[in-house]
A protein has these predicted regions:
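Buried hydrophobic side chains on well-structured beta-strands
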Residues: 63, 95-98
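Basic, flexible linker segments flanking DNA-binding modules
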Residues: 1-34, 180-191
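RNase H-like two-metal-ion nuclease catalytic core shared by retroviral integrases
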Residues: 15-17, 97-99, 103-112, 119-141, ...
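An active-site-proximal beta-strand-loop segment
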Residues: 31-66, 72-73
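Short small-residue beta-strand/loop micro-motif enriched in glycine and branched aliphatics
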Residues: 64-68, 119-122, 146-147
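C-terminal domain-tail junction helix/linker
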Residues: 113-115, 139-227
């Protein structure tokens, strides 16, 4: 009948009382442009051999997934790796995360501070504070992961890349007045502002090119995104 059992998964946001927690900066903030706020989070994907973990960064304004990483652990270095990938698109003013140890520990905090990124953390138990990425998790789980039942991390990486590419570049989004996330994110950007060929080759080697760089025809008028 095509039914899929969904079992409870591991907690991905366990805190550490020794780590640094910053205030939540998004309450009452008017978010009007791409690269003003990015949000990061982790979700799990169950394979026959065990769990793998999907890290993703979403641009709050456009819903564009600026970077993602699929890893066999949920340690902080994979969060930093994901942010490093995203920096080809620019540096956000604010990056919001939950209070998991990956995003409150020294490795993550130091990396953001060195880039002059303002750090924002959700309140304890308040997943609604990071609602953009939570809604994306719901979308990718129910429209891709639960339907395809990936068997290997290689298969999952390829399939997730194809889905994220579709989500970014082809799928109209109701909250964006049926624009695509990429149309909003890249509106007014020149080709020179897009990732370099060298970086494309790096992603190709990692098997993640599918999600990132498809030629985009912008079909609406928007204000230019600050470089």
């Amino acid at each position: 009948m095509g039914l899929v059992a969904i079992y409870p998964g591991p907690r991905t946001s366990l805190g550490d009382p020794k780590n640094s927690v910053y205030p939540y900066l998004l309450k009452g903030l008017e978010i009007t442009r791409p690269n003003q706020v990015w949000a990061v989070d982790i979700t799990y994907i169950r394979l026959p051999t065990g769990m793998v973990y999907l890290f993703a960064l979403i641009d709050w304004s456009s819903r564009f997934i600026v970077a993602w990483t699929l890893a066999n652990s949920m340690t902080a270095d994979h969060g930093v790796e994901t942010l490093e990938k995203a920096l080809v698109f620019g540096v956000p003013d604010i990056c919001n995360a939950d209070q998991g140890s990956q995003f409150t520990g020294a490795e993550w905090i130091t990396f953001l501070l060195n880039l002059n990124i303002q750090i924002s953390h959700d309140g304890v138990g308040r997943c609604i504070d990071n609602v953009r990425i939570e809604r994306f998790w719901r979308t990718i789980k129910y429209e891709d992961v639960h339907l395809k039942q990936y068997q290997t991390i290689k298969e999952a990486r390829k399939g997730l890349g194809q889905f994220i590419n579709h989500y970014n570049y082809q799928r109209p989004h109701q909250a964006l007045y049926y624009e695509r996330p990429a149309d909003i994110y890249f509106a007014g950007k020149q080709i020179g502002a897009l990732p370099s060929q060298q970086y494309k080759e790096v992603l190709l080697q990692r098997g993640q090119l599918e999600f990132a760089f498809r030629p985009l025809v912008t079909h609406s008028l928007h204000s230019p995104i600050p470089a």
